[in-house]
Structure formats: structure tokens, C-alpha cells
Amino acid sequence: MNGKIIKGIGGFYYIKTDQGLIECKARGKFRHKDIKPMVGDDVTIKMEHGKGVIEEIHERKSELVRPTVANVSLAFVVFAVKNPDINFDLLNKFLILCEYNNIEVIVCLNKIDLVSEEEREEIKKRINVIGYEVLFINAKKGIGIERLEEKIRGNITVFCGPSGAGKSTLINKLSNKEHMETGNVSVKLGRGKHTTRHSELIEVADGYIVDTPGFSTLEIKDLMDKNSLKYCFPEFTQYNDKCKYRGCLHYKEPNCALKEAVESEKINRYRYEFYVRALEEIIEEEKNKW
């Protein structure tokens, strides 16, 4: 019998099948091979003495670490436009994580009533220019929900973003229930409390959504090596093979096509500077390993 893991708690996995939801444990062989079932996994299960057992985990199309979710095909990166202000460094980190895992990204900007139309367009332009679609939403008022449902259809969609951006409120709207506790934003800090207890797939609009377990502490240097980073910036693609030196990191090498594009304002300088900072962190991390 085949199904999909929609929830995992304490070694038990809840599999959605044609025969309903079945609670399962994983075969010991997975533990011996250091393989752990993940929410989002497509699996084959078997009933033994009235209890479900996971026999096979099908090949994963993608795999996230934070949150621990498999087969995600779309990511909504949720940020508030105000309260708190957008942290573009953190936004870049989320974008890189998604790119590294080959997951399509849509940036969702919440609390749109807190800024003017002019400010919204300026933010949208800044994100569009690096290759990402932007949707404006108001999670509390339900503005933009239908657009999100259109995108969710046929996908496993993950929501990521900082605490206080409105992810839990948004998921409550989409799932039509108080699926998770929603932390109030601290007036002093302007940040939400860590409230999400675990990852779980929720069926919405002929697709699935999964929330991150609160806010993730992302470290790019732990995700990839120095040669992989440049491929996580879509706007760099057309320049990666045009440099004088093969394997150019777009860092200190001469005759670099990307650096020339930055100087001629074809590439956003802020994004390039962020790339350099991230690259230097990776290089330093690699030095420390040896």
C-alpha cells in the first residue's frame, strides 16, 4: 500500500493512503542505514498484526533540513513589510536555501496595510529584479489568500521566514482552522514567539502546505561549499561561464564577467556584496575544517 507521510511525532508516522490515515513505525533497516523518514515522503507500507510498518521510502525529489520536509516543490518565503522591517540579509539566506534545494520560490509580503503603495512597489521592484515573484498579502484580513491557493495546487509548499512575519496566521487562514498557536509579537522586540511545535502537512486546495518549526537558524556555510554558492543566485547564471578563468568564484579573480556586470549596474551591488560575505564565511569554515 502506498501513501504519503503527513505527520511525524516521536517515532510514529501518520500516512495518508487511499484507505485513510494509518499510524506506522519505520522498519529497523532504515535506522541501521541511518535513513530517517521525513514528512512529505512517499512510502510503501505494510500492515502487520493490525499495525502499520513503513517498508520502503521512495526516491526524494528534494529534501530540506530546517524544516525536515521531503518532496517540497514550492516555497513561500514570508516577510512582513513592516513591524518588523524586512531583513534583506535574512531574506537572501532563505532564497539561497530554496535555490540550493531546487525549490521554486515566491516571496510573500505580509502586513501590506502598514506601508504606502509607493513603498510596496519599491520593495517589489527590488525583489523582482533578482528573479523572484512577489505576492502582497494581509494574513489577518485574508487578502491574497486565493492567489496563494492557486499556487499551492499540485505542490507540497513550505512556508519559511522570520518569526513575527505572519506564517502561522497565514496557515490558519489557508487551512480554515486554528491549526497552530499564534504567538503575539513582542512590542519591545517586534518579533514573534516561537510557537510551532512540529512540521505537518495540511491538505489545502488540492495540494499540501507545511509550516517550519518556528524560526530557523540558517547558516549558509553549513549548507554548501564555495563552488556551489554562485549557482544559488539566479541572476548570476548568464555570467558564470563568461569569466576568463574557469571555475571563477567572482571574488578576487581578474577579468571576472560578473564583477564587470556589477560595475555596469547590470547586477545588484547589494546582492553581490551579500554573496561575497557569504562566500568568505564558507571559505573561513572550510579552512577551519582542515
Curated annotation (Swiss-Prot):
Name under which the protein is recorded: Small ribosomal subunit biogenesis GTPase RsgA
Xref: InterPro entries: G_CP_dom, NA-bd_OB-fold, P-loop_NTPase, Ribosome_biogen_GTPase_RsgA, RsgA_GTPase_dom, RsgA_N
Entry keyword set: Cytoplasm, GTP-binding, Hydrolase, Metal-binding, Nucleotide-binding, Ribosome biogenesis, RNA-binding, rRNA-binding, Zinc
CDD domains, per database record: S1_YloQ_GTPase, YjeQ_EngC
Similarity field: Belongs to the TRAFAC class YlqF/YawG GTPase family. RsgA subfamily.
NCBIfam families according to UniProt: ribosome small subunit-dependent GTPase A (TIGR00157)
Positions with a binding annotation for Zn(2+): 243, 248, 250, 256
EC number: 3.6.1.-
Biological role stated in the UniProt entry: One of several proteins that assist in the late maturation steps of the functional core of the 30S ribosomal subunit. Helps release RbfA from mature subunits. May play a role in the assembly of ribosomal proteins into the subunit. Circularly permuted GTPase that catalyzes slow GTP hydrolysis, GTPase activity is stimulated by the 30S ribosomal subunit.
Enzyme class: hydrolase
Domain spans labelled CP-type G: 61-218
Cofactor note: Binds 1 zinc ion per subunit.
Gene3D superfamilies: Nucleic acid-binding proteins, P-loop containing nucleotide triphosphate hydrolases, Probable gtpase engc, domain 3
Chain residues that bind GTP: 110-113, 161-169
